[in-house]
């Protein structure tokens, strides 16, 4: 059953940009992302193509907007993360929150990721930037102090963990995403052993 906050979100009037993003995601769930044009998205959204291009000059700009929407939802749901938990458990919860948000459009996300991996350097660079922003957000939500070279290393480690969990999640057919959770827990446990040797390790919080 939908909770009160979900009901509130569903009653809010969508903006034209949200309509464009959702139209793109619907198409991506049905066909390869690299085969979709802005004209296709405009037709799906039932808006003039010129109006869509005014908001999104390129498909990449549309994906950036979608990425920001995901970040906003993760930020809102991340308030449920308890600072009483150790850092490893906080990171586990934060990553699962992000995957849960992406789960609203899993088929579309899979299509976009496949196209990104086969895309041009500009698309790949944008994907790397989005990953870094997402991992930075996760560390912030979990109360990890910002700044320092050590944090840069932590971001790289967490990025690899997240990408591996994402790979499993895209193919996870268990009702409770059990395979994904097991993969993520195992990776975070291994990272815990590695990063405990570093000062202010993100996985070395209160026990």
Describe every region a protein language model picked out.
Residues 1-31, 39-40:
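Basic, helix-initiating cap at the start of DNA-binding domains
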Residues 2-7, 140, 171-207:
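C-terminal peripheral helix-coil segments that are non-catalytic and often amphipathic
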Residues 19, 27-65:
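Helix-turn-helix
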Residues 28, 60-70, 74-75, 112, ...:
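Alpha-helical DNA-contacting segments of helix-turn-helix folds
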Residues 40, 93, 111, 153-164, ...:
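Amphipathic alpha-helical interaction segments
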Residues 65, 79-111, 118-119, 129:
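Hydrophobic alpha-helical connector segments
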Residues 66-73, 101-108, 130-137, 158-161, ...:
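Amphipathic, well-ordered alpha-helical segments in soluble domains
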Residues 121-144, 152-163, 182:
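Amphipathic alpha-helical packing segments from all-alpha helical-bundle domains
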């Amino acid at each position: 059953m939908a909770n009160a906050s979900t009901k509130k979100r569903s009653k809010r009037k969508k903006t034209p940009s949200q309509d464009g993003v959702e139209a793109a995601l619907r198409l991506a769930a049905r066909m390869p992302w690299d085969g979709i044009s802005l004209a296709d998205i405009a037709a799906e959204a039932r808006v003039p193509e010129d109006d869509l291009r005014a908001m999104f000059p390129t498909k990449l700009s549309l994906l950036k907007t979608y990425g920001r929407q995901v970040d906003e939802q993760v930020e809102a749901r991340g308030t449920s993360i308890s600072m009483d938990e150790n850092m490893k458990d906080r990171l586990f919860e934060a990553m699962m929150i992000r995957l849960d948000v992406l789960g609203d459009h899993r088929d579309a996300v899979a299509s976009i990721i496949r196209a990104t991996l086969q895309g041009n350097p500009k698309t790949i660079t944008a994907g790397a930037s989005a990953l870094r922003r997402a991992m930075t957000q996760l560390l912030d939500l979990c109360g990890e102090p910002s700044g320092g070279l050590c944090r840069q290393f932590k971001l790289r480690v967490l990025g690899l963990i997240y990408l591996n969990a994402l790979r499993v999640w895209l193919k996870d057919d268990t009702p409770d995403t059990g395979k994904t959770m097991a993969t993520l827990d195992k990776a975070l446990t291994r990272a815990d052993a590695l990063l405990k040797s570093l000062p202010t390790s993100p996985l070395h919080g209160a026990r």
